């Protein structure tokens, strides 16, 4: 059996896509809480938006009948997990799993956005 050509392909950064019921409300949340900036939007009215901060990117898609999942939508790394946790707590963000050191070498917590999308945030320790 010959090796698959997949082994010669290098993968880069992945950008998660999130369904949201109100794309403008989601934009306000991600910009105010996480400091993300809108770098692209499409549609009239807007139905798709790309948000970015540093190397992190989130793609939002309008879906009025979105039902939140019970699993994490994605994981992202930050360089000051304690500061982000404090920002989330002060803003009244719904914390799903509180901040703690994990046995897999990360300090992490999970929060939910206004649409119930669960975001896992970690920092390597």
Regions found by a protein language model. Give the residues of each.
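Vicinal oxygen chelate
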Residues: 13-21, 49-52, 63-91, 107-112
